Amino acid sequence: MSDRGQAFTLEAITASLLLIGGLVFALQATAVTPLSASTSSQHIENQQQAAAEGVLTTGLDDGSLRRALLYWNDSANDGSGGFHDAREEGYYVDKTPANAFGRSLNRTFTSRNIVVNVYVYYEEAGREKQQRMVYRGEPSDNAVSASTTVTLYEGARLYAEDGSPATTTITNDTFYAPNATSGGSYNTLRVELIAWRQ
């Protein structure tokens, strides 16, 4: 009986060594990482996408996006102005607008080294035209975008540099987007926000 017990013990030890050896081999043969590079990158892009959509939705809900669209300086009254305190191109290159929408962009993106471009699309003579609001360069391959629409109505007033409503109303001569409709609405603007990591 003792020979049989020794054989069973030897057999059990051999089986356990084979099992442990197989597990060690399997673990060494496969890489065990929490996220691969592409999965991690996709996760970051998903976060940026959600943030871009959130900024636009919040701006639409609290009115800051509409006010930013109307934050236009046309002191020459010829339609060729630009956003307040922007460079000579008429749009922001090295900063964001000095209003609630600009602060939201800074808080959400700029403070995290994420670059944004903001484009405003509008209809003119049946064709879509573009006005840059913020332009920081060409987006990278991993850029995300979100967009929303804002309808402006006839009689809407531009906003002064201090953020207060100005006396000037939007017309073809005072605003970048022309009156493209009739019946009370002035033009429907599509705002696109593109974000990418520097």
Feature roles, as predicted:
Residues 1-35, 51-52:
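Secretory targeting signatures
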Residues 27-198:
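Long, compositionally biased, intrinsically disordered regions
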